[in-house]
Amino acid sequence: AGFAGDDAPRAVFPSIVGHPRHTGVMVGMGQKDAYVGDEAQSKRGILTLKYPIEHGIVSNWDDMEKIWHHTFYNELRVAHEEHPVLLTEAPLNPKANREKMTQIMFETFNVPAMYVAIQAVLSLYASGRTTGIVLDSGDGVSHTVPIYEGYALPHAILRLDLAGRDLTDNLMKILTERGYMFTTTAEREIVRDMKEELAYVALDYEQELDTAKSSSSVEKNYELPDGQVITIGAERFRCPEVLFQPSMIGMEAAGIHETTYNSIMKCDVDIRKDLYGNIVLSGGSTMFPGIADRMSKEITALAPSSMKIKVVAPPERKYSVWIGGSILASLSTFQQ
């Protein structure tokens, strides 16, 4: 969250709400009935953590309202009655959801004006383009969204319920093979950090596995909060490989490369060339080193041989949805 015209968000915190597991345990802490974001994260040992956004779509409005309240009051510290608000939504978000969002903004927060933009479209704007296909992969959901001259093509948008949370779960699972047990919601956050620090995408998965077996070149150490140091090797690239091979976690779905290709094939034949040449990665789950090269290699193998393929991975892509929103909301034409 932040202000239009800024080049980076002022507030970045996880969309989690924590409710105390036992009431009245924390003596003298002036116990709240709910904690949001980083505070929920740091007190996670005594809380039950919940994600009000599932697969990119809000499923728990009470908790979502708490997150918005926290954003206005504690993070941005602005009077919400005085500021127009730009919110974003997942592609193919149900209409009822958008209406509920609008209702809460006007009735609970009394905002003067609001607009709801599609996340992937904002990412494309942030990359300086108006035509291209965006692969947006966050924590709960991934989407491929073809956009032509500023407009998303809804018939060709594809959704993949595979994203950051599943990669963290996968890493938790494969760490147990090494005898490292991570199970609680608190421990999951440790594994998420490990994933963000150490995971990468292999250009050739099988070859990388052979390398990992025969040498220790891919091994890295990771220090846990209690000081214990663990070593991970092949787990580093096995974790995000699921994005390309969902069958590894028992999902019957096409990988992100094939989903992107399928999305392009649902578009008019005349615009495919523009899409192949402007494949833009966006979202936290596209931050793995090596992902753009792998994506390029896989799509080149699927596309017609003469086709020029370009995969763009902007360095700020973790926040490119926000940056696109900042650009859009600061245009004078938009404010009218």
Curated annotation (Swiss-Prot):
Keyword check for Cytoplasm: yes
A GO term, aspect molecular function: hydrolase activity
One Gene Ontology cellular component: cytosol
Record's catalysed reaction(s): ATP + H2O = ADP + phosphate + H(+)
Entry similarity comment: Belongs to the actin family.
Lineage: Eukaryota, Viridiplantae, Streptophyta, Embryophyta, Tracheophyta
UniProt xrefs under InterPro entries: Actin, Actin/actin-like_CS, Actin_CS, ATPase_NBD
Miscellaneous comment: There are at least 7 different actin genes in tobacco.
UniProt cross-references to SUPFAM superfamilies, sorted A to Z: Actin-like ATPase domain (SSF53067)
Listed name of the protein: Actin-103
EC main group: hydrolase
Matching PROSITE patterns: ACTINS_1, ACTINS_ACT_LIKE
Keywords of the record: ATP-binding, Cytoplasm, Cytoskeleton, Hydrolase, Nucleotide-binding
One GO process term, biological-process aspect: cell division
Species this chain originates from: Nicotiana tabacum
EC number(s) per entry: 3.6.4.-
Cellular compartments annotated: Cytoplasm, Cytoskeleton
Location (main, coarse): cytoplasm
Keyword Nucleotide-binding: yes
Pfam families assigned: Actin
Known function: Actins are highly conserved proteins that are involved in various types of cell motility and are ubiquitously expressed in all eukaryotic cells. Essential component of cell cytoskeleton; plays an important role in cytoplasmic streaming, cell shape determination, cell division, organelle movement and extension growth.
